[in-house]
Curated annotation (Swiss-Prot):
Organism of this sequence: Staphylothermus marinus (strain ATCC 43588 / DSM 3639 / JCM 9404 / F1)
One Pfam family recorded for the sequence: EF1_GNE
GO MF term (any one): translation elongation factor activity
Described purpose of this protein according to its UniProt entry: Promotes the exchange of GDP for GTP in EF-1-alpha/GDP, thus allowing the regeneration of EF-1-alpha/GTP that could then be used to form the ternary complex EF-1-alpha/GTP/AAtRNA.
InterPro entries membership: eEF-1beta-like_sf, EF1B_bsu/dsu_GNE, Transl_elong_EF1B/ribsomal_bS6, Transl_elong_EF1B_B_arc
SMART domains in UniProt: EF1_GNE
Protein name: Elongation factor 1-beta
Top-level division of the source organism's lineage: Archaea
Protein family per UniProt: Belongs to the EF-1-beta/EF-1-delta family.
Keywords, alphabetical: Elongation factor, Protein biosynthesis
The organism's taxonomic lineage, starting at the top: Archaea, Thermoproteota, Thermoprotei, Desulfurococcales, Desulfurococcaceae
Signal in keyword set: no
Amino acid sequence: MAKVLVLLKVLPEDINIDLEELKEKIRKALPEGYEIKGYDIEPIAFGLKALRLYIFMPEETEGGTEPLENTVMNVEGVSQVEVEAVHRIT
C-alpha cells in the first residue's frame, strides 16, 4: 500500500512557544502509521514563525487529511493548521 506525504503548516499560539518542543508534542500525538519525516521553520512576520511538517500517513485513511489536522489542532500550543500539499508516494 502506498503512503501519502502531507506538508502541514502549523502556527503556534504565541511567538514564545519553542517550535522544537511543539514538534515533539505533535510527534507524540500522532496515531500509529503516521510519521514526521522532516520539518522546517518559516518566518511569518513580527517574530512569528510557522512549523512546516512533512508527515507520512496511510493512503487509505478515511476522511483524508482531516483526522491528521484534528489531531495536530488538539496539541497544546497549536493555534492554526493548514495543509499546503498532499503527494502520493509509491
